[in-house]
Structures are given as C-alpha cells and as structure tokens.
C-alpha cells in the first residue's frame, strides 16, 4: 500500500511543478535558459541530477559488479571532469552567459555554418543519450506493474511520453524544478539501500564471507591484467576525464548569472558526484558479498528484492526513475532548442521559435523511444551516441573557450575529418574499440595543423586563397 502512495505522490508533485512552470514560458530564451535567476543550490542540483542519470546507476551497477576497480576508477575520473570545468572553464564563460545553446556560442565565433553543424551534431548525439534513459524504464516498470504482465516496451513508451510532454511545455524552468525533487529522491534512496544491504551482509557468517573472491576490488588487479584490458582501461579513463561539453552541460554554464556562481555550483557538483559514485560502488560491493555469482540480468532484481519493508522498494525505484527523467528531460529540452534556435528557424521571432521547439520536443522524444529498441547494452548505446558529438564539437569548443583565434574553414575541415573517421569506424570497418578518443585526437591534429600551416603561414595564398585570421583578430 505504501508503494502505491509513494508512486502517486511522486507523480503528483511532478505534474504540479510542470503546470506551474509552463505558465511563464514566453519565448525561446526563457524556454532554453530560464530567467537566469536560479540559486546556486538549484543550479548545483540540476548539474548533479543530469550527470548521475538513471542509466548511470544501471551502468555503475553492472560494470562495478563485473569489473570492480576497472570501472570504478574511470568513473571517478568523470567526477574530476566537473572539477576541471569549475577551475578552468567556468571563469571563461562570462562572454557567453545567457546564450541559448552550445551552437549559439559556436556560431558567435565561427559563423553560421558551424552553428548549424554543431546544432545537428548535438541533436543527434543527445537523441541517443535520451534513448539510454528511456531504455531503463523497461526494467523499472516491471517492478511497479509487474503483476499485470505488460510488455516492457509499453513502459518505455509510457514514461518516455510523460517526459516528452513536461519537457515540451515547461522548458528548462520545469526541468530545474523537477531536477531538485528528483535529486532529493535519489539521495534518500541510496542511503536506504546502503543501510539495508549492510544489515544483510552483517547477518552473513564470517566464514562464508571470507571465501568470497574480492580480488577485482583490489588495486593490484589492474596491474596484473592483460595489456589489451589495461589499454581499454586507460582509454575509458581519458574519455571520462573529458570536460562536460555536451549540450546540456553548456546550457548549465550559460544559465548562471555570474561566473562565481558557476564555479561554486560545479565545484559542489564535483564533490556530490564523487560521493554518489563511491556510494554506488559500495552498494555494489555489498551486493557482491551477498551473492558473487549473479548474472547481469539478475543484479537489479536482486537489489530490489533485498528491500522487504513496505514502501522501501518504491523509494529506490522512484530515486532511479527520478535520475533517468532528470537527464532525459534536460537533453530533450536542449535538443529542441538546438533545432529551433540554431538551424532552419534561426531567423524566426523568439515566440515562433518557442512553438517550433515544443514541436521538435515531441519529434525527438518519439525518435528516442524508437531508438531504444535497436541497442541493448546501455554503455554501448551511450558511447555510440556520444561518438557523433564529442569528437566533432568538443575540440573546437574548448579552443573557443580558451580564446584560440581559429577560422571557420579550419573548424569545418576538422569537424568533417573526425565525422568521416567515426562513420568509417562504426559502419565500414566495425572496429572493436570506441573511436571517440582517436577521433578527438584526429580533430585536434587537423584543426591546429590547418590553422598554423594553412592560415597562419598562408601557404594556400599561392592558389588565391587568403587567410581570415587577420579579420578575426580585428573583430576581437
């Protein structure tokens, strides 16, 4: 009975927040970055909620259990990417406060072509990230309505539709309000999970616990592994260390009212995310001690079934659903903004763009629901989606933030090269590794080589092609 009460209360609070937020959405700028009057607490909660994510919990659960420190250490590197943003990027965002999207920032420096390319890459990559969040609803729904024997696909459609609706009408203000509710629910749920599992492990006789092989959770397991596994470990560490330059993260950097607020919010978020990662790892470690022979498909059911007190199971499920909804609505909001504000409708009025953004929220939400049925592994789907944004946009975006004076054609050339490389790796030669890091490296090499050889040295002037570098310096 308590489970039903908690589910109903959670949905009711969300609906109320959505209705209240939707009343004050007047144009695309408010839809994208709100009125920029968010408190540091609100900004911190939405950063944490977006970065934790429901899919992140499932990935942490399966990968920590299966790989131990081989996944925990790279996951901790993800936390330090937020610290990097706080220390080195936030203080450089003053010229871009209030910008509606990452594409608007790129277009401001590099031109409209780069703005459109960034918007398309961002929307495509974000669609995959939304699908990752939607996918976990298939598992969660069975614990809410499992007695009715409903096809899991309907859970994806149901929750995906709810998120699509409230993101479409409420804009980022609705996203921020629900993020706070969802983050609080998640923190409560993981505290309860630790207490329940700790008591369960404490009841197991010591002679049984001593026989459990926990070598994968020891640091020496990394140095005693095969070279291929160590190489993949290093690549994953570097990948997670990349600063959070996805469209939703940039949105969190532009909606602040001052750079000091941004630095504080991202630093606190770093600490909270680190606590969450370590806490989730401890939950998995306790789960492993209770049963070290679980299959991947048995992990979450075993965790859920550990909670025998009425209402406790609902709190954990609500916490995970909250994180999935929080991340999905953030990416859904920014993807609609990218298309409405930065592609074909960029010359329309701000009110017209708002209408277009809401329509695209529906289209992207439906597309993400469809995409969930094509890939099963969450980490694989996450990396696949990111491979069409991170290698293409991150390098020129960081160059812009750190005030490198690059020209439009150099950026287009580097973006096109990395995009072709990713497509070849995915669809032609089918490499066994994720091409994100090699593609980023290729992007950087092409970008700065073309800048220093073609633009700065003007070697192409012999062919009648002149450098635009002087124009950029003059305009700045």
Predicted regions and their residues:
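Membrane-embedded helix-loop-helix hairpins and adjacent transmembrane boundary segments
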Residues: 1-476
């Amino acid at each position: 009975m308590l489970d039903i009460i908690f589910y109903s209360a959670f949905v009711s609070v969300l609906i109320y927040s959505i209705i209240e937020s939707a009343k004050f959405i007047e144009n695309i700028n408010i839809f994208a970055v709100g009125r920029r009057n968010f408190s540091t607490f609100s900004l911190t909660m939405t950063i944490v909620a977006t970065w934790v994510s429901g899919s992140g919990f499932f990935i942490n659960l399966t990968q920590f259990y299966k790989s131990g420190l081989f996944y925990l250490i790279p996951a901790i590197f993800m936390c330090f990417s937020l610290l990097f943003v706080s220390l080195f990027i936030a203080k450089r965002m003053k010229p871009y406060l209030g910008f509606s999207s990452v594409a608007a920032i790129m277009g401001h420096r590099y031109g409209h072509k780069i703005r459109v390319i960034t918007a398309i890459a961002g929307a495509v990559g974000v669609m995959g990230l939304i699908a990752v969040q939607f996918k976990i609803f298939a598992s969660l729904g069975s614990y809410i309505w499992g007695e009715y024997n409903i096809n899991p696909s309907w859970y994806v459609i149901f929750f995906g539709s709810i998120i699509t609706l409230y993101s479409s009408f409420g804009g980022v203000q609705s996203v921020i309000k629900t993020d706070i509710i969802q983050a609080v629910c998640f923190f409560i749920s993981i505290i309860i999970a630790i207490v329940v599992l700790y008591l369960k492990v404490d009841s197991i006789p010591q002679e049984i616990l001593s026989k459990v092989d926990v070598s994968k959770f020891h640091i020496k397991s990394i140095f005693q592994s095969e070279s291929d596994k160590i190489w993949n470990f290093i690549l994953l560490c570097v990948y997670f260390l990349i600063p959070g330059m996805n469209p939703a993260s940039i949105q969190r950097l532009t909606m602040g009212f001052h750079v000091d607020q941004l630095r504080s919010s991202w630093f606190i978020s770093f600490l909270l995310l680190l606590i969450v990662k370590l806490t989730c790892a401890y939950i998995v470690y306790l789960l492993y001690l209770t049963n070290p022979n679980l299959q991947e498909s048995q992990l979450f059911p075993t965790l859920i079934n550990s909670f025998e007190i009425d209402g406790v199971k609902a709190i954990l499920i609500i916490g995970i659903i909250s994180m999935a909804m929080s991340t999905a609505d953030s990416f859904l909001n920014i993807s609609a903004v990218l298309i409405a504000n930065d592609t074909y409708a960029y010359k329309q009025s701000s009110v017209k763009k708002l209408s277009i953004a809401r329509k695209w929220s529906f289209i992207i939400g439906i597309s993400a629901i469809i995409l969930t049925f094509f890939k099963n592994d969450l980490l694989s789907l996450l990396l696949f989606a990111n491979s069409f944004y991170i290698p293409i946009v991150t390098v020129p975006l960081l160059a812009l933030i750190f005030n490198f004076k690059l020209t439009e054609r150099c950026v287009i050339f580097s973006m096109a090269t990395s995009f072709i490389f990713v497509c070849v790796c995915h669809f032609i030669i089918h490499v066994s590794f994720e091409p994100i890091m090699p593609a980023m490296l290729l992007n950087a090499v092409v970008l700065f080589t073309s800048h220093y050889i073609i633009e700065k040295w003007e070697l192409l002037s012999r062919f009648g092609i002149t450098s635009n570098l002087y124009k950029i310096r003059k305009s700045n």
